[in-house]
Amino acid sequence: MAIRIKSTRVGRFVSESVGLGHPDKICDQIADSILDQCLLQSKTSHVACEVFASKNLILIGGEISTSGYVDVVQTAWRILRNLGYNETDFSFLSCINNQSLEINQAVLKNNEINAGDQGITVGYAVNETKQLMPLGVLLAHSFLKQAEKLTKQFDFLKNDMKSQVVLNYSLNQVECEEVLLSIQHTNAISLTELRKVIENNVILPVLNQYGFQDKKPTCLVNPGGSFVLGGPMADTGLTGRKIIVDTYGPYAHHGGGSFSGKDPSKVDRTGAYFARFIAKHIVSLGWASECEVSISWVFSKPNPQSITVKCFNTNIQYDEVLINRVVNNYFNWSITKIIDKLKLLDFVKYSDYAVYGHFGNDLSPWEQPTELDKLECLIKNFH
């Protein structure tokens, strides 16, 4: 059964997500936990942490300048123990350096935070869900969140897992055509029984939650067969390799920079959060039903180089040129102001965002459109 939806999309869109125990996400969680520990001790910490996991080895590297002290290995073990690993499973190598003095001097000038690098960041919003996120992205995450709950109920389920969802859009309605789940398990359950458990306890409940109740999609559970060996033992992991999972799936562009392990002076993270903040304002105001915001940055400069808004012909009340004028006039914020406004050094525990996406959680400061009245007033003056 297709459900009604506010959307002008036509055709198939495929979204994916990965779980807590996926090797790339293990690395992201470790990197963000190290970042959290640094910022907890000193808000002026500069962190660019990378993690590599393969077989029984975990390598933690990068540049960290902080007045505090963080035991990166013990921080990593807190993540790994939560996933069921013990001290005999991994050895560690650590190669942490201070941030380059040249970069540090360029980033901090006159108590102002400047862009830690050049780059392009992208934000997106669409009114097809109440979170103003693409439906397929939310579905892909929801299947794995539900499966994660089951790992606490059934010992035969493990944390390395992936999802993939095929949605077919047409004429303001959407059908879920196919759901693919690959979930690590033990030898204590047969593949046939595993498929029944996942279909009945994960796929169908989530589909019902989203209104897909009458027509069951094609369900593929572990289509490759058994999946006993998982995590870094089966597949090498690296920070920053799931940037599309972290954002908007196939629905929007991406600037290319990853988020995990990076403090707010890094525009890859802060710029992407800011772009989402702007896009959500535009859709919340009804200026467009779909919006993509691209922001470019110049190394050592405090303000955006450019902000470009695309509405994909979904803007009715105001011309896209006018929307761009208003956005560039109002949101030409410095990085210091962005960090303050989005509470990036006060509110955020970054490891909470290392899995299941950085956008769509209404509690996140960048998800709260606080400037609606000011923008509405400004566009009327420009109009």
From Swiss-Prot:
Query: So where does this one cross the membrane?
Result: none
Which parts of the sequence bind Mg(2+)? D24
In short, the EC number is 2.5.1.6
Keywords of the record: ATP-binding, Cytoplasm, Magnesium, Metal-binding, Nucleotide-binding, One-carbon metabolism, Potassium, Transferase
Q: Which reaction does it catalyse?
A: L-methionine + ATP + H2O = S-adenosyl-L-methionine + phosphate + diphosphate
- Enzyme class label: transferase
Q: List residues binding K(+).
A: E50
**Any idea which positions bind ATP?**
H22, D160, M161, K162, D235, R241, K242, S258, K262
Query: Which PROSITE patterns does the entry mention?
Result: ADOMET_SYNTHASE_1 (PS00376), ADOMET_SYNTHASE_2 (PS00377)
Q: Name a single GO biological process.
A: one-carbon metabolic process
Question: What protein name is recorded for this chain?
Answer: S-adenosylmethionine synthase
